[in-house]
Amino acid sequence: MACGFRRSIASQLSRVLDLPPENLIKSISAVPISRKEEVADFQLSVDSLLENNNDHSRPDIQIQAMRLAEKLKCDTVVSEISTGQGTVNFKINRELLTKTVLQQVIEDGSKYGLKSELFSGLPKKRIVVEFSSPNVAKKFHVGHLRSTIIGNFIANLKEALGHQVTRINYLGDWGMQFGLLGTGFQLFGYEEKLQSSPLQHLFEVYVQVNKEAADDKNVAKSAHEFFQRLELGDMQALALWQKFRDLSIDEYMRIYQRLGVHFDEYSGESFYREKSQEVLKLLDSKGLLQKTLKGTAVVDLSGNGDPSSVCTVMRSDGTSLYATRDLAAAIDRMEKYNFDKMIYVTDKGQKKHFQQVFQILQIMGYDWAERCQHVPFGVVQGMKTRRGDVTFLEDVLNEIRLRMLQNMASIKTTKELENPEETAEQVGLAALIIQDFRGFLLSDYQFSWDRVFQSRGDTGVFLQYTHARLHSLEETFGCGYLNDFNTACLQEPQSVSILQHLLRFDEVLYRSSQDLQPRHIVSYLLTLSHLAAVAHRTLHVRNSPPEVAGARLHLFRAVRSVLANGMKLLGITPVCRM
């Protein structure tokens, strides 16, 4: 990608440096655009060439760059060669740049940037992504929103790159909280409320029974006994648990549909209640299980009895724990999917838990444990609705839709829409996702309702507005101009800046594929939208000569296509009117 320009430059460099072109491809990068000056299209970092050089004298980088530039020649692709601070810079023939980039964007469609030489030679893998994973007995809160949208982004990106992706929602549907919930429902539950609003009612019951159990030992004892009945397979207890689970999943699926998220498998800790006992037996047979004075069973991760480096895998009554069930799930998934990579997306508070799980798998002799990866994220602070603290994710989604509808109604330029509620939801979700994805995933961030709905500046609303405006341009002028175009009509600085930015899309996708951070794509799309806004103001289509109008429509169509591609990877549905 970068339309073959990178490979053409690498071929010339390989002859001078006596290195295979493949070794040079990733050292040649598209230059970020600059508002201050016109920049070259590509640059080679001389420092990157010297990284593997064993010559400790390492001559001055600038001298090396100049010597290399002198050996290179302009050709039909490269029109100018210069040097920068430790770099050799390449300017592409302007008309070739224009024609090739725009043709490539239109021809490749949703695959633009993904066919790049940066990705060539990378094997297609089987990848499992576990994300969202709410606890059935507890509130489906905003932390699960982060896991949901981050996991969805990672799965989207891996799928777009041609990998075979399995999306798993691993529900917290087992454990002591179900002892509390079963007892609590028998004491405080109402069947009508459970049927009409399962997540809300189960949460209310869970809060109430926790208070009772703290004050009344008999309630705590009943809860413990109920969970033991579950573990032993008591039919009556399991029937009540199954009802809680089924009703909750139905409501989750409705919420996921609003988010535009889907899963290939709804799994859960309950699937591994028996297999976790097999894991305990396996640990015991390998001499890894140690009993404590309290009757619990632990695995020593230090190898020398360090009490601070143990992981508890069994309660004193023989019931399993979260870690045990995660071990059983990992082993089962390897048998089922034979994955090359398994990614867990949870908050950073679970970092130690996953370190221990991966370490135990290694100790058990499973070499594939190194293929398991935890992608942690920080906490969202300050996300409250007008009624106060947020309890449920659905409250947030409803608030977003309501506020966006009010915003749209107050703006004079808002178009008449067939389904204003659906548009408001899509724009609102874009606003939420962009605010979340702008920084490092690991960072905590302060949520701001005011900032999230700004139509100007670096927001999701601005991205949606840009996409809708460009779509409107195509609708207004139709596709009659788009049969062919004159490259000489797109040589203004505004056009060239957009073309240079479009060149960089594959590098941005590559960076995000390496570190799984969506911020690279977010930053790229925001810059693209700002460039499009400037071009829209200065490069008029209306009242321009047909040849000029057609060329500009080609440019704006390419921008909209790449903008839509990037938004979809992030989990955003682009709107065509707003």
UniProtKB/Swiss-Prot annotation:
Its EC number is 6.1.1.19. Belongs to the class-I aminoacyl-tRNA synthetase family. Residues 1-16 form a transit peptide. It is found in: Mitochondrion membrane. Signal peptide: none annotated. CDD domains: ArgRS_core. Catalyzes the attachment of arginine to tRNA(Arg) in a two-step reaction: arginine is first activated by ATP to form Arg-AMP and then transferred to the acceptor end of tRNA(Arg). GO terms for biological process: arginyl-tRNA aminoacylation; mitochondrial translation. GO terms for cellular component: mitochondrial membrane; mitochondrion. The modification N6-acetyllysine is found at residue 568. A motif ('HIGH' region) lies at residues 133-144. It catalyses: tRNA(Arg) + L-arginine + ATP = L-arginyl-tRNA(Arg) + AMP + diphosphate. This is Probable arginine--tRNA ligase, mitochondrial. The lineage of its organism: Eukaryota, Metazoa, Chordata, Craniata, Vertebrata. L-arginine binds at residues 133-135, 144, 322, 326, 350. Its main location: mitochondrion. Pfam families: DALR_1, tRNA-synt_1d. The keyword Ligase applies. The gene is RARS2. SUPFAM superfamilies: Anticodon-binding domain of a subclass of class I aminoacyl-tRNA synthetases, Arginyl-tRNA synthetase (ArgRS), N-terminal 'additional' domain, Nucleotidylyl transferase. Keywords: Acetylation, Aminoacyl-tRNA synthetase, ATP-binding, Ligase, Membrane, Mitochondrion, Nucleotide-binding, Protein biosynthesis, Transit peptide. GO terms for molecular function: arginine-tRNA ligase activity; ATP binding.
